[in-house]
């Protein structure tokens, strides 16, 4: 009887300890990225996110980063999470618009939201819930993980002044913005960051846009093209994403799930500040040391771009793709609301500062 009682007691004790023991188990996740190793802002942001999760969890969840091409090709990063080759990826949702065009809205939209507006939509105006619906189909979960702010319009071998100058232009530009440029006559393609310079150098591209001065300086585009158009009207605010395997994420204890969420939020803010601080410094270097010409798109191109953007958005909103349609409707409703704030705060303030405040 004593032996039987001891056995029963041991079983109860083991059951009691099992849940805490599991919650303390150490795991390692693999994060694949679309960014080159040590890439300013975005690639470093992925590394920082991995470090945050590892540190905040006390090592219970450690994340090992594989930069573009180290484990899978950069534009197969999401597929690696879907098929289980990695637990996590870091990139931009509009790279996957072939899976659902609605995903483009979670990166940035031509003539759409600024960075703060976009974050407001995703976090407080229903965007995250729709994003979850789209990614549910693939067994993954997406989180905002960084933001570049308003991007540069691109690098061009020759100056472009009219819409006619765009006809047949071989241009690297992804997402809905790529569709806009295609409507304006460009021949559009998408390439990963590390592939763009070679394409420009080989002459297979006439123009390329990626992010802005901070990243573009590192990629060396100025060595091939000197005409740098700013700002972008197709990427007024561009967010990056961290994607996790939904089954792996849900298997985590509640505190580790919250650590992943909080780490993504913290790194989103960190990347945004990093980009704002270093873009102007990099631009000065491009101009002063490398002879880059900073140009603005003509009103003709801006107006044609706006019209084409409206056509692209209308096409998504009127499509048979229910989730893409739902995404577009939610985005446009949020943009309409958020413009009422911008119209009486940010926009007039920036005009007034530029016009009247000359203090240095």
Regions from the PLM with identified roles:
Residues 18-20:
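N-terminal signal peptide c-region/cleavage motif recognized by signal peptidases
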Residues 126-127:
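Basic, amphipathic alpha-helical recognition segments used for DNA target recognition
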Residues 6-14, 23-118, 130-360:
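N-terminal secretory/targeting leader peptides
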Residues 1-4:
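Bacterial Sec-dependent N-terminal signal peptides
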